[in-house]
Amino acid sequence: MEVEYMNFNELNLSDNILNAIRNKGFEKPTDIQMKVIPLFLNDEYNIVAQARTGSGKTASFAIPLIELVNENNGIEAIILTPTRELAIQVADEIESLKGNKNLKIAKIYGGKAIYPQIKALKNANIVVGTPGRILDHINRGTLNLKNVKYFILDEADEMLNMGFIKDVEKILNACNKDKRILLFSATMPREILNLAKKYMGDYSFIKAKINANIEQSYVEVNENERFEALCRLLKNKEFYGLVFCKTKRDTKELASMLRDIGFKAGAIHGDLSQSQREKVIRLFKQKKIRILIATDVMSRGIDVNDLNCVINYHLPQNPESYMHRIGRTGRAGKKGKAISIINRREYKKLRYIERAMKLKIKKLKFG
C-alpha cells in the first residue's frame, strides 16, 4: 500500500530544504514527489518513473539530490536533458531549492562558449546539460564522471525521439559503475525499457497518476473550416496557451493570419535566431502574446505553469507527442483544456492515441 504524504514535513527533509520549499510556495507534494522523494532518499534502488510534463517531477529528484550531494566532494550528480532550455530550467529549479547549502551547479549545453563551462566544471557538484556538449567535455578531458553517485535521465522518450540514446549510453559508460540511476519519461517505449534493463538491473518502477486537471476534447470539422474553428476557440478573452502545428511554415502562416484579424499571436520556429526565440518566449511569459504557435520540436523547453489551454491545430505524429503537448496545461494544480481540431479522416488517428494512452477524449459540441 502506498503512503500518502500530506505535506513536505512528513518526508524527513532538512530544515534548509523545507524553508526553500516554503519560499517557493509549494504547499504539498505532488503524486510523483510523494512517490520518488522517500524512495530516492531512503533506498539504494535505481528508479524508473513515468511522469508527464507539469507533474512536479523536477522537484522530485532535485530535492533528494540537494540533501544527498556533498558540496566538498566534486561532481557527484549529473542530469541529462534533451534540450538546453530544459537544462536551464532544471538547473534553476535546483538553485531555487538548495537554500543555504553551498552546492555549485554547472549548466553545460551547446550554443555557449566552452571555456566558461570548463571553469564552472572545476568547482561543480551537480552538472546539468545536454548529451552532445556533455560528451564534448568528456572527450576533451574537462569533465570527469568517475565520482558520480547519481545519474538522472530526464525526458528519456524525448531523448529517443531526438536521436540521443547512443550519446546517453556513452555518458553512462563514462560514469562510476556504482552510481544510482533515475530515469524519467512521460511514456515508456520499448527502447526506453530496454535501456533501463541494460544499465539499471533491478529498479523500482513508479507511475504518476494521470493529470485529472486536463479536460481533453476534440472538434470535428471539414478541412476548409479548420482555421474558422480555431478562431472560434481563441475568441475566449481568457485564452492563454499553445497552438501546435505540423510544420515550421504552418506556424509562420497561422500566426500571421491570426495577427491580421487582431489576435495577439506569436510563432516560434527554426528560422528564428536564439535571441529572437528568447524574445518571443519572454513576451509570451509576460502575456503580451497570449497565443503561441509552435511545432513539437520548437516547443521543447517552454516552461509556463499557468497555460489554460493547448490546441492541436494538427494532430501530432504519435501518442507520445500528444502526451508531451497536453502536459503543457493543467500544471501546478490548475485546471487546463486540451482541444484537438480534426477532419473526418483523422478520427481514427485520434482514437488510436486515445487507446494507446488510455485516455478519454470527448467530442466538443460546437453549436
Curated annotation (Swiss-Prot):
Q: Which Pfam families match?
A: DEAD (PF00270), Helicase_C (PF00271)
Q: Which Enzyme Commission number(s) are listed?
A: 3.6.4.13
Assembly, in brief, is: Homodimer.
Query: Which residue numbers does the motif Q motif cover?
Result: 6-34
Keyword annotations of the record: ATP-binding, Helicase, Hydrolase, Nucleotide-binding, RNA-binding
Give the species this sequence originates from: Methanocaldococcus jannaschii (strain ATCC 43067 / DSM 2661 / JAL-1 / JCM 10045 / NBRC 100440) (Methanococcus jannaschii)
- Gene3D superfamilies per the UniProt record, alphabetical: P-loop containing nucleotide triphosphate hydrolases
State the reactions this protein catalyses. ATP + H2O = ADP + phosphate + H(+)
- Write down the InterPro entries for this protein, in alphabetical order: DEAD/DEAH_box_helicase_dom, DEAD_box_RNA_helicases, Helicase_ATP-bd, Helicase_C-like, P-loop_NTPase, RNA-helicase_DEAD-box_CS, RNA_helicase_DEAD_Q_motif
Which lineage do the record's taxonomy fields give for this organism?
Answer: Archaea, Methanobacteriati, Methanobacteriota, Methanomada group, Methanococci
According to its UniProt record, this protein's enzyme class is: hydrolase
| Residue numbers covered by motif DEAD box | 154-157
SMART domains noted in UniProt: DEXDc, HELICc
GO molecular function terms attached to this record: ATP binding; ATP hydrolysis activity; catalytic activity, acting on DNA; RNA binding; RNA helicase activity
Protein name in UniProt: Probable ATP-dependent RNA helicase MJ0669
